[in-house]
From Swiss-Prot:
Organism of origin: Saccharolobus solfataricus (strain ATCC 35092 / DSM 1617 / JCM 11322 / P2) (Sulfolobus solfataricus)
UniProt gene name: csl4
Family the entry assigns: Belongs to the CSL4 family.
Residues covered by the S1 motif domain: 66-142
Signal peptide range in chain numbering: none
Primary localisation category: cytoplasm
GO MF assignments: nucleic acid binding; zinc ion binding
InterPro entries referenced in this protein's UniProt entry, alphabetically: Csl4 (IPR039771), Exosome_cplx_N_dom (IPR025721), Exosome_Csl4_arc (IPR030850), NA-bd_OB-fold (IPR012340), S1_domain (IPR003029)
SUPFAM superfamilies linked to this entry: Nucleic acid-binding proteins (SSF50249), Ribosomal L27 protein-like (SSF110324)
GO cellular component term, pick one: cytoplasm
Compartment list: Cytoplasm
Gene Ontology terms: biological process: RNA catabolic process; RNA processing
Name this protein carries in UniProt: Exosome complex component Csl4
Length: 189
């Protein structure tokens, strides 16, 4: 019998059928319980079942508990943006998860274009609205929005100037964004 919480790959032996029955993410072959998916082993001692919690399932459990996620804006259309979720709260993800941000979920104020509030390459702090694919995000709340951005003219770091504007310290360019509470301010804070 393998160790609880250990990483397993499909086809690997977990237990014999006399010890544990098959559960989620497992199958039985010639009296041996084997992993059906990549994930962590979980033995249900009460029901005597051998389970494998797939990484997708584990990530979704973390997403449901998360207060916020960190994402990078990949592409923008007229009414939405495609975002790669790269972190759940303060923890980074090994591989990004795709999500989308609809224009109606950007601000409580009317905006005509997604680019009035975010730009490609911006790092945003967002909240999940759905836990099924496609994942939907919102940045409407006061503490959510852009937390890291670069100047569209020279590529230098933008610093928060006021409630809606960011200023480039190199070229002086001023850009408008929906700014989150952790946006870089003058002095690097």
């Amino acid at each position: 019998m393998r160790t609880q919480g250990e990483l397993t790959l499909p086809g690997e032996e977990l237990a014999v059928i006399e010890e544990f029955m098959t559960g989620d993410g497992t199958y039985e072959q010639n009296g041996i319980v084997r992993a059906a998916v990549v994930g962590k082993i979980f033995y249900d001692m009460l029901n005597r079942k051998s389970n494998v919690l797939g990484f997708k399932k584990i990530i979704f459990q973390h997403l449901k508990k998360a207060k916020y996620v960190i994402g990078i804006v990949n592409s923008i259309k007229e009414d939405s943006a495609l975002v790669s979720i790269v972190g759940i709260e303060e923890r980074g993800l090994a591989s990004p998860i795709s999500a989308y941000l609809h224009i109606s979920q950007i601000s409580n104020k009317k905006i005509n274009n997604v680019t009035d509030a975010i730009k490609i390459g911006d790092v945003i702090k967002a909240k999940l609205l759905s836990y099924t694919f496609p994942l939907a995000l919102t940045i409407k709340m006061k503490d959510l929005g852009v937390i890291y951005a670069r100047c569209s003219r020279c590529g230098y770091l933008l610093i928060k100037q006021d409630e809606n504007n960011l200023k480039c310290q190199r070229c002086g360019n001023i850009e408008q964004r929906k700014i989150g509470s952790y946006m870089v301010k003058k002095g690097g804070n």
